[in-house]
Amino acid sequence: ASRLIDIHSQHQNLILASEEFRNASARIVLLHIPLGNGTWHGNIHLEELFLPILNDADIDVMLSGHTHRYSFHPANDKVRFPVLVNDNESLLKCDVGDGKITARIYGPEGTVTHSHEFPLK
């Protein structure tokens, strides 16, 4: 297991050090299981694996699912980027422009149920 973690961490470090990542206009992380708000062993493992890398990567926002419930977690001392979790019945759309990421969640009826803006770093 530790070898897998080492390989995974090395791969993430290569991506984050790449010219494409450094020059990206927006840095959005997609991760099924949200970081920073769980006590399940899977959450803890992912936090140990990814937080040291992502916290230093100027991430604009993380988009997640897993819980099947909407939630929003602003950046804090543990997770230094906002985490937006979508439920299992809604559509999440993001637009990048004008120095920000605009995220809108559309419920089953097609109306906006939640909206967030994240300034680009």
Residue ranges and their predicted role:
Residues A1-V79, V112-P119:
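His/acidic metal-ligating clusters that form di-metal
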